Amino acid sequence: FQFKPDGSVLAIGRRGGGKAQLLKSKPPYKRWERRDLDRYIGGPLLMKWGDRYIAGGRKSGAALVGKRGPKTALYWLNAEAKTEQDHLTEFAELPSNGDTSYPGFVELSPTRAFVSWYSSHEKDADGKSITAIYMADLEIQK
């Protein structure tokens, strides 16, 4: 959830294996506006970075045609877009595969942030998949 200065709230909701939804509400939060996004987002993240919103989570299915397994990705969110296709713009696919999701995000400045996620894309010395937590330092070049 992200609360705006006017008290309204913005959220991303996962809907099983279907398309995620953008959720909006105003106090007292009894009525919610729901809009389908154009893709599935597992373990969704929604954060404010500078003057923009970012969303993140696991992508799978049609989003990965020609690729192997689920990936964790980050998107710019345009909460005011009028069509499904205009809400999300992917800007990063994190090193990931298999069991992967739940990105975390810490804004350090309007142009720099840390992101964390877990993934099972690496193998141990015996060739068995391991699940590990990863962190990346992101910087926006202006």
Where are these regions (language model features)?
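Beta-rich carbohydrate-recognition and catalytic domains
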Residues: 1-98, 108-114, 118-142
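Signature of short aromatic-glycine-proline-rich micro-motifs recurring in repeat-based ectodomains
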Residues: 102-104
